């Protein structure tokens, strides 16, 4: 149970906030609100869920250890009537711009445009890690040469075998075909009455709060 001091801002928000309408997504009909995807980030989410210890240090430890042995997969992507093949380290679908903790995997994503922002990280070398890490936290990862990005309303990801996916950091096993779609204007949220008209970080603040509870 979270401490009362943590809940106080939210009880105030429920009493005095305004209702706004934003997008959310579905991955094989499972709702997500910020990001979902396949590949390395999903694999790390699975390993993290099995760890006896929690917290950001455990997550960092799992990320570093697993990155040394993880092998990229080849995916077929179907969207807007076309099919593309990519060998990818990860494929992230963003409704919001970041995973959490200021790691911006889809820096151009917004919560009210009715589109998924898809980020593909192609295979890279150890020499690429410093720039990728810096750009991930500097909102410029979409400018890296190892990154491919596009926008769509629906996306089918086909892989050679079933495996793990993640939705908002939670792992789940799914089949060879993974269907991702955006649900435009499908979610009502409460925002602070005195906030500027900008919902780009509403769900992200909620996601950071939820992540904090998971690490307790």
For the regions a protein language model found, what residue spans apply to each?
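Short, small-residue-biased leader/transition segments that mark boundaries at the very start
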Residues: 1-13
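Gly/Ser/Thr-rich active-site loops/lids in small-molecule metabolic enzymes
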Residues: 50-58, 107-128
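ATP/nucleoside-binding phosphotransfer catalytic cores, i.e., glycine-rich phosphate-binding loops
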Residues: 79, 85, 110, 120-216
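Short amphipathic beta-strand/extended segments with alternating polar/hydrophobic composition
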Residues: 7, 32-35, 83-93, 166-169, ...
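Glycine-rich phosphate/pyrophosphate-binding beta-alpha loops
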Residues: 37, 41, 92-107, 171
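Short acidic/glycine-rich loop or secondary-structure boundary segments that cap or lie
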Residues: 41-44, 85-87, 99-102, 126-129
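Catalytic core of DAGKc-family lipid kinases
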Residues: 11-89
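A residue-level signal for conserved active-site and pocket-lining positions in enzyme catalytic cores
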Residues: 25, 44, 91, 118, ...
């Amino acid at each position: 149970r979270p401490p009362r001091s943590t809940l106080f801002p939210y009880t105030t928000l429920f009493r005095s906030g305004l209702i706004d309408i934003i997008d959310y997504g579905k991955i094989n009909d499972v709702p997500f609100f910020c990001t979902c995807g396949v590949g390395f980030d999903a694999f790390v989410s699975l390993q993290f869920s099995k760890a006896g210890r929690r917290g950001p240090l455990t997550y960092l430890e799992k990320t570093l250890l697993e990155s040394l042995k993880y092998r990229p997969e080849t995916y077929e992507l179907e969207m807007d009537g076309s099919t593309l093949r990519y060998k990818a380290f990860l494929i992230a679908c963003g409704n919001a711009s970041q995973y959490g903790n200021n790691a911006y995997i889809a820096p151009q994503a917004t919560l009210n445009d009715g589109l998924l922002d898809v980020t593909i990280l192609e295979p890279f070398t150890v020499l690429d890690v410093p720039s990728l890490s810096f750009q991930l936290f500097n909102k410029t990862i979409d400018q890296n040469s190892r990154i491919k990005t596009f926008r769509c309303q629906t996306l089918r990801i086909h892989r050679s075998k079933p495996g793990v996916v993640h939705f908002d950091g939670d792992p789940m096993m799914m089949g060879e075909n993974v269907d991702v779609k955006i649900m435009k204007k499908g979610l009502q949220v409460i925002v602070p009455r005195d906030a500027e008209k900008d919902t780009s970080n509403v769900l992200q603040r909620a996601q950071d709060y939820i992540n904090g509870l998971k690490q307790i």
